[in-house]
Amino acid sequence: MPGYQMPDISPLLFLQADTIRYDKSRYDQQNRSLFMKFAETIQDIPNAFRPGPLKIEELGQFYYDKTMSVRTGDAYISPIEDIYEACKVPSEQNTFLLLGHKGCGKSTELNDMAARLAEDGYEIHMVQCGTDLDLNNPLYADLLILMGEALVTIADRTGCRPDEDTIETVKNFWQEETEEVGTLTDGSSIEMESGVSSETPGTLTKLLHLFAGIKSDLRYSEENRICYRNRIAKRSSEWIFAMEKIADAITDTLDGRQPILIFEDLDKLNPQDAWDVFYRHAATLAGVSFPVIYTFPIALSYRPDFAALEGYFTWKTLPMIKQEYSD
């Protein structure tokens, strides 16, 4: 506009996909380029948007924690806060479905919740399904495999040592299958030494190496993927029991605080694939004793038979940020 001088708008609020606040009092000019580029003019505003969520290390500088009043209409009603509180109280129904439209801020809110739980002394593992799985060919067994790996990761990180029977159960559960599969797709060995126990140095690290090979097969090898899925399908109750034993050992190590798992990217599944995974295997995916949060396609909540999942999962919806205009 001729004769119009653009005011300095750098200290103002700019919305990105996950509602990010720029707080001038906490803004460090020297670190300005480390996170994102702020708009200096109206023309720059589109370039200041970022489609990805805030990372945990960015929360302190950019996270804005007062969006619930414009999401739910009430600052004291928060689906994320409900899940946060529920995760801290052991319950028979400890699995959650988090629904929300793409870009509404689910991942950022989950990252913030995970950071707060960590401050409270809990161990959280974020499972990135978009990286670890082929989202075009999902099966419930894949989630149970990643669940087991997540628990072993937490156990290794916390110095937890599950009892020898549990270690032996996990080792034998997959050893028999990997012997049939042979060499993993990445060319690594799948064997573990006989006689390993919870006191053997590096035992959990060796289990994690085995899981790394299995994950590679789940994503890239159709033939081996079928073998692993069949093992879970035939012996899912045995695998869940082993996972719960590991979770119990972690809980004891953390003075009663249960491990918490968050499955990201499942809301990006084809709705029919997601329905096949969760509806047909609801009892299995919800049948664990520790808190698990699954992101979930919001479109499926409009199905008339969605209510059938309520008996297995606690579901919460993160609404979009609502805006009101003067006109």
Give the label of every model feature segment:
Residues 21, 153-157, 320-326:
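Charged, low-complexity surface segments at secondary-structure and domain boundaries
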Residues 3-23, 27-117, 121:
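Walker A/P-loop-proximal flanking segment of P-loop NTPase domains
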Residues 94-96, 100-256:
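P-loop NTPase nucleotide-binding core
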Residues 38-41, 76-79, 143, 235, ...:
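Alpha-helical structural motif
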Residues 48-56, 83-101, 174-189, 217-233, ...:
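Charged, low-complexity, helix/coiled-coil-prone segments
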Residues 35-46, 67-92, 207-222, 263-284, ...:
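Short, charge-rich amphipathic segments
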Residues 9-11, 34, 44, 223-231, ...:
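The catalytic "switch" region of P-loop NTPases
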